[in-house]
Amino acid sequence: MKILADQNMPLVEQYFADIGEVERFDGRQLTADQLIDVDVLLTRSVTQVNNELLAHANKLSFVGTATIGVDHIDTQLLNDKNIAFSSAPGCNAIAVAEYVISSLYALSQENARPLNNQTIGIVGVGSIGSCLAQKLQALNLTVLLCDPIKHAQGLLNEHVALDQLLAQSDIVTFHVPLIKSGEHKTLHMMDKARLKALKPGLTLINASRGDVIDNQALLEVMQAGADLDLVLDVWENEPTILIELLEHVRYASVHIAGHTLEGKARGTQILYQKFCELKGIEATKSLDEFLPVPAITQATLGQSFNEADIARLVHLIYDVRRDDGILLRDLANNGFDSLRKNYPVRREFSTLTIQGDSSQLAALAQLGFTVAN
């Protein structure tokens, strides 16, 4: 069995080597000819799986994407061709939520504005948005939720309409899929009219899809003097992003919000488990076998622990400003995709075990840290 996997997917050999021969490919350079005699295709979001790509896929029986979103996959085409498909729902939800939390604490420190005095609006309450909401609510922060699809399905009673949420929030973070048309279209949901109407001092965070915000309109609004704090991990037209926008962004990164070691490896594991299920193979391998011990594993709290100390713990594991520095310094020389490919190892909050008798331990556990018994 021949297995073709994106070069940036971790642990594919460890999970799939007993099943077949694993070959790697560049996610943006994959061609139809490379799929000749391939049985399994494992991708990420940079690869468009469409009729053109599958033109010579004579043996393909399974396509898996190690991502939550599936807007890069023609799922109807796969169904028509009787090719099994799986995404990896929830694989990087924790990672993206932690990216946002790191950004929130960094902004709070730099702007001298405590988080408990601010209202945070979350647009999109799927696996990532709901994960983030749970963590923020554990810290007793004020959170507003907007998800018209879930609301229509009766799954979100506390839904706040987008324009109302934008008006009432101090920070707005987007976690929606890219929907290009229809009633719930998210393509350019933040268009020039909405961007111009934003209240001064608002923080916008986008770690979903770059096309959710009209980047050219955002640049024009910022050039006209808009008072907005921007945290952008995703961009229109990646990897050829709008360079002029960078100087207006507080924290900028290269679509890596979900790129913890655990998050990426979890995506591979989910696809391995799904493939084994479809093929009737026993799934014997688990993530714990492969993850290395992190550099820092324990911390002890004192009684005087406060919000500033939570920020220090968060940034001990991951500080978004590190990635902002990498992008600004290296984009011109190395390019967007090279920075993604060579992204430094990043771990999740759960790798740090916290002990002590602080009253904050329960909140830290909800935030994702491991708390010693």
Curated annotation (Swiss-Prot):
Positions annotated as active site in the UniProt record: R209, E238, H255
Reaction catalysis annotation: 4-phospho-D-erythronate + NAD(+) = (R)-3-hydroxy-2-oxo-4-phosphooxybutanoate + NADH + H(+)
GO cellular component: cytosol
Places the protein is found: Cytoplasm
EC supergroup of this enzyme: oxidoreductase
PANTHER family: FORMATE DEHYDROGENASE 1
Stated name of the protein: Erythronate-4-phosphate dehydrogenase
Annotated source species: Pseudoalteromonas translucida (strain TAC 125)
Lineage of source species: Bacteria, Pseudomonadati, Pseudomonadota, Gammaproteobacteria, Alteromonadales
